[in-house]
């Protein structure tokens, strides 16, 4: 049986220059430490949809062409840089991130040629249905 090994990372919801992991490393640095012979995909998840396009373009400049890129953002309120208690309480979802608005982000990501799209925390079935309808 063949298994697909994936590398998944969350991105800081706010950054000044290059996108960073929540642990503080720039994406370029983190991706440079991956053995791409052992994975099939790099995924960015559970972060604001607004930061994903920059993460995609940054990754595309670093990873081999045969590695898939995927994105599934969340609908939570942004986590501030340096906030250490991000999971200490239930976070509110963004009311303005409607299925239609999320679909606009998905279209942007697909124009950047990502292979995998979906949704994370706060992205519901109605959001996913819009993505599925786009593919029809």
Which residues fall in each region the model found?
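Domain-level signal for soluble alpha/beta catalytic cores
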Residues: 1-136
């Amino acid at each position: 049986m063949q298994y697909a090994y994936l590398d998944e990372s969350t991105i800081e919801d706010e950054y000044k220059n290059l996108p960073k992991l929540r642990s503080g490393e720039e994406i370029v640095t983190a991706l440079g430490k991956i053995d791409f012979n052992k994975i099939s995909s790099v995924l960015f998840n559970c972060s604001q949809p607004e930061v994903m396009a920059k993460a995609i373009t940054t990754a595309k400049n670093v990873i081999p062409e045969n590695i898939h890129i995927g994105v599934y953002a969340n609908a939570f309120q942004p986590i501030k840089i340096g906030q250490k208690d991000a999971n200490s309480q239930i976070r509110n979802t963004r009311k303005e991130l409607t299925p239609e608005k999320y679909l606009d982000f998905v279209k942007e990501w697909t124009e950047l040629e990502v292979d995998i799209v979906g949704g994370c925390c706060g992205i519901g079935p109605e959001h996913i249905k819009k993505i599925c309808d786009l593919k029809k």
